[in-house]
Design a protein with these regions (language model features):
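Bacterial N-terminal signal peptides
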Residues: 8-17
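Bacterial Sec-pathway N-terminal export signals of envelope proteins
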Residues: 14, 21-69, 98-99, 107, ...
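Acidic, low-complexity, intrinsically disordered peripheral segments
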Residues: 22-24, 395-420
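Small/polar, glycine/serine/threonine/aspartate-rich low-complexity segments that form flexible
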Residues: 22-28, 71-104, 108-110, 221-232, ...
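A glycine-/polar-enriched beta->alpha junction
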Residues: 36-46, 53-68, 82-85, 93-110, ...
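Amphipathic alpha-helical coiled-coil segments
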Residues: 47-59, 126, 130-151, 167, ...
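Short, charged, amphipathic alpha-helical segments
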Residues: 110-113, 176-185, 377-385
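Periplasmic alpha-helical coiled-coil/stalk elements that build and connect Gram-negative outer-membrane
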Residues: 126-241, 337-344, 387
Length: 420
């Protein structure tokens, strides 16, 4: 009796956690609706999009010429700055303009355009990663809620059985030991349900952050019980698709291209820029009212930008290695995702059609058979545990198959298999 009373106390403590979802606002949501909200409201994506806009603004900035420089000097000893009407007057004005040589301005514009392309690819890669997390969270929530329903169904059956056994115990038809074992089974199941509820809360938190939703809302994913996967691509086609579509591969290639453009720019910097100017000198030159044309350029004797050119050449070698590393990584990721999907597809095909429907009916019959004392308590408990294990494994297998398809989509950078 003390154990029975302890179990009842613990169950009463856990029940508020088990029923927590009922006190919150529940929203049924499809994967398509979740992705639409994600694309519109996710702040990480919005912030990354600003980087694209910033890079585009810097392209425009790179196109501008340097401002001209105005030089002048006047006398200040008597405060009469422009006494040019008298024999002592003096005015000196010089206007200069720097002219970029060796195509420096165009090369700088090209580097800025590379940065725009890089920012766009970073945005695409972030979206790819976040969408993968979103779809995995959706699949995880779907699995958790379906497992929750199995627990709730089993708990309801055991609670009904427990009430009947209490009456049978009072009538002396069953032993205290059998009654306690059923209550212990119920308690263990309720404990598992409470633990599952905490896992649901963690997944809901991450899902809500991705959707940027406020309030105490519980999202309930809407997905068909069975997931049909049809893969029509060969492994070679999948590898080519990943090479052409993955934004992180494109980003590595853009970095290599940008480093090549930077080398061209650094070589151009070794060519001196030309400064041209026009000047007027009223009285201090060899003649009054002197007009002159000025040209100046630094002599490339001490600094010919060799260090930066060498660094740019090394950056190209580094970028080449990074492209090769990225291509090898992508290849292995696609191969692993492909093999995983094939393995889970084969496992799914071994499950008989309508297996769980028959098992559910058998569970109801088993509960009734135990109430009618047609099976022993040990047989009932063994069957009950086996049913829970089989039902949850079936759900996990379906979720794993869906996740494997999502992983293949993720590793190839495009939707190879559409999952709703």
């Amino acid at each position: 009796m003390p154990f029975c009373r302890l179990a009842q106390v613990l169950i009463s403590v856990l029940l508020p956690f088990i029923s927590v979802a009922q006190s919150q606002d529940s929203v049924r949501i499809s994967l398509a609706d979740a992705e639409q909200v994600f694309m519109q409201k996710n702040l990480s994506l919005l912030a990354q999009q600003y980087n694209v806009d910033i890079s585009k603004a810097l392209v425009q900035q790179a196109k501008y010429w340097d401002n001209p420089t105005l030089n002048t000097d006047q006398n200040i000893y008597d405060g009469k700055f422009f006494r040019h009407n008298s024999e002592f007057g003096q005015v000196y004005v010089q206007l200069q303009q720097v002219i970029k040589t060796a195509g420096k301005r165009n090369k700088l514009v090209q580097l800025a355009q590379d940065d725009v392309l890089s920012a766009q690819q970073q945005f695409s890669d972030m979206m790819r990663n976040l969408r993968f997390i979103l779809r995995n969270d959706f699949s995880t929530l779907n699995l958790q809620f379906k497992t929750w329903r199995i627990y709730q169904s089993e708990i309801a059956s055991l609670e009904k059985l427990s009430v009947g056994m209490d009456a049978q115990l009072q009538a002396g038809n069953i032993s205290q030991k059998d009654n306690i074992r059923v209550k212990a089974l119920l308690y263990n199941l309720q404990t598992d349900a409470a633990s599952l509820q905490q896992s649901i809360a963690d997944t809901e938190k991450e899902f809500a952050i991705l959707l940027q939703t406020g309030g105490d809302t519980v999202f309930i994913p809407q997905r068909e019980d069975s997931v049909n996967i049809h893969l029509s691509y060969s492994l070679g086609a999948l590898l080519d698709t990943a090479k052409n579509n993955r934004p992180d591969v494109q980003l590595a290639q853009t970095n290599l291209l940008s480093q090549q453009h930077n080398l061209s720019y650094q070589k151009a910097l070794a060519t001196p820029d030309l400064t041209v100017g026009v000047e007027y000198d009223q009285r201090s030159s060899y003649i009054n009212n002197f007009w002159g044309l000025g040209l100046s350029l630094p002599l490339p004797i001490l600094n010919r930008n060799k260090g930066n050119i060498k660094a740019a050449e090394t950056n190209i070698k580094q970028a080449n290695v990074q492209v090769q590393q990225m291509q090898n990584t992508v290849q292995q990721e696609v191969i692993a995702a492909y093999r995983k999907l094939l393995s889970l597809q084969h496992l799914q095909q071994t499950v008989p059609q309508g297996f769980m429907e028959k098992y559910n009916l058998l569970l109801k019959n088993m509960v009734q058979s135990y109430q009618d004392r047609q099976v022993s308590l040990l047989e009932f408990i063994d069957f009950f545990d086996a049913y829970k294990e089989a039902a949850t494994r079936q759900l996990q297998q379906q979720a794993s198959l869906a996740n494997a398809a999502e992983e293949l989509n993720y590793t190839t950078g495009t939707t190879i298999i559409s999952i709703k």
